[in-house]
């Protein structure tokens, strides 16, 4: 297989796998930040519309986690046990499941776009129109995102994080070129605005997926993805194994997003600037959680392979090393958000009211960054052991508490109370 994570120095092995994954996660953050920076030139109403549409692409990632997490953990554990044939079977089942769910989500999104966007009760007509346009395109072609996430997980399970990184790098460059061209329409190009942003993002996702798929075909190296058949019947053993690990993760991801949607709906009562702030603020914050999540993905594969091989000492040492790394990163992000909120906000907003709102948001969320990084790392470790149900129960229980707390604090403190 591409990479054996059960041998060699623990920290070096883990870091070698983690750095490309964290870099890929950072590129994912840049995807979104690039969009927001260009869309910000269209005004806060356009940003608010994309923010609403982005909630549904985020929700889809929770569903996609079923195939990604289930496939990644099962494949990595099989590799650790030396069961290459079963690893291939789980990989094929994961890709098939991702393709099916991606197409199903796209179809439902196209049929119910009006109802989905209507949930947020956007009072501004321009923001509502932007949300409709973005959602139809970004969710209507969401299958590329489903496939990309799952292929990334399966590459990572084999100890190969460089291929997804290179694919994402090319996708980012594509997105950065297409964004200003399609959004602003310089020269002979038409100004597509929010629609252009959605087209640029989907095109980049399609390119990333294609590169990872072609790498399997072109390279001569052994890969569990070689020879998969999308239309073959999925054996119950493989489907059940993926769902057993993947469903709790998917439920956790979708529940978290659904709760965020409820909070966004509460925030929308304070105007388009507030919604835009929450959307952009979330993208800025993703510098923290995407990096931690990327390290958690590396730790997940590391632990799954070593757990499958019965090397629990490496499992424990790998977790401790990861915890220190992401904890320090979280502290640095906290300092940046709390000490320099205005310079950060001014990158994305150009209206005084929106900048002031964003400054308050960044300071509030800044205090939780280190804790969040530790949480994501621990979830990655437990998931590598196959304990996804425990992670799901704990996460959903405490995340759900955000709604009553937002109602109480929002009533006492206004908009800032919801964010606290």
Outline where the language-model segments fall:
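Small-residue-rich hydrophobic transmembrane alpha-helices
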Residues: 47-107, 145-164, 264, 277-340, ...
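Helix-loop-helix hairpin linking two adjacent transmembrane segments in secondary transporters
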Residues: 140-144, 148, 152-156, 164-210
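Short alpha-helical transmembrane segments in multi-pass integral membrane proteins
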Residues: 1-18, 75-141, 189-247, 303-368, ...
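Hydrophobic transmembrane alpha-helices of multi-pass small-molecule transporters
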Residues: 59-62, 175-180, 209-213, 287-290, ...
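N-terminal transmembrane alpha-helices
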Residues: 5-37, 41-42, 58-70, 74, ...
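Transmembrane helical elements of multi-pass membrane transporters/channels
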Residues: 16-35, 137, 171, 204-208, ...
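Transmembrane alpha-helical core residues of multi-pass small-molecule transporters
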Residues: 54-57, 101, 170-175, 200-208, ...
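Helix-terminus/linker motif at the lipid-water interface of multi-pass membrane proteins
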Residues: 26, 30-48, 117-125, 181-192, ...
């Amino acid at each position: 297989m591409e990479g054996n994570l059960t041998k060699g120095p623990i920290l070096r092995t883990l870091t070698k796998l983690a750095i490309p994954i964290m870099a890929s996660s950072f590129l994912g953050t840049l995807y979104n930040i690039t969009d927001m920076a260009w869309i910000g030139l269209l005004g806060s109403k356009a940003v608010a519309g994309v923010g609403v549409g982005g909630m549904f692409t985020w929700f889809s990632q929770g569903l996609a986690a079923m195939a990604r997490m289930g496939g990644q953990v099962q494949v990595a554990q099989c590799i650790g046990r030396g069961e290459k044939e079963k690893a291939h079977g789980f990989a094929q089942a994961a890709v098939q499941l991702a393709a099916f769910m991606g197409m199903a989500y796209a179809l439902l999104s196209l049929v119910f776009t009006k109802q989905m966007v209507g949930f947020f009760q956007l009072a501004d007509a321009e923001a509502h129109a932007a949300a409709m346009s973005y959602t139809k395109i970004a969710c209507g072609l969401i299958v590329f995102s489903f496939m990309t996430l799952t292929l990334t997980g399966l590459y990572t399970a084999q100890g190969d994080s460089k291929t997804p990184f290179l694919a994402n790098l090319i996708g980012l460059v594509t997105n950065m070129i297409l964004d200003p061209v399609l959004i602003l329409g310089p020269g002979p190009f038409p100004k597509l605005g929010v629609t252009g942003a959605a087209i640029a993002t989907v095109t980049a996702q399609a390119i990333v997926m294609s590169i990872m798929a072609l790498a399997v075909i072109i390279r001569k190296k052994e890969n569990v993805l070689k020879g998969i058949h999308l239309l073959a019947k999925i054996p119950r053993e493989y489907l059940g194994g993926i769902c057993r690990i993947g469903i709790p993760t998917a439920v956790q991801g979708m529940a978290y997003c659904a709760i965020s949607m409820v909070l966004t709906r509460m925030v929308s009562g304070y105007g388009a600037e507030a919604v835009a702030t929450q959307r952009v603020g979330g993208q800025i914050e993703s510098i923290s959680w995407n990096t931690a999540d990327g390290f958690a993905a590396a730790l997940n594969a590391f632990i799954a392979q070593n757990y499958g091989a019965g090397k629990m000492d490496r499992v424990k040492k790998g977790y401790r090393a990861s915890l220190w790394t992401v904890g320090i990163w979280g502290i640095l992000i906290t300092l940046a958000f709390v000490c320099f909120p205005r310079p950060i906000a001014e990158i994305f907003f150009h209206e005084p009211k929106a900048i002031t709102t964003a400054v308050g948001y960044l300071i509030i969320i800044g205090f939780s960054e280190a804790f969040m990084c530790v949480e994501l790392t621990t979830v990655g470790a437990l998931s590598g052991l196959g304990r996804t149900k425990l992670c799901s129960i704990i996460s959903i229980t405490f995340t759900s508490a955000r709604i009553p707390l937002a109602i109480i604090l929002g009533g006492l403190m206004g908009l800032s109370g919801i964010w606290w």
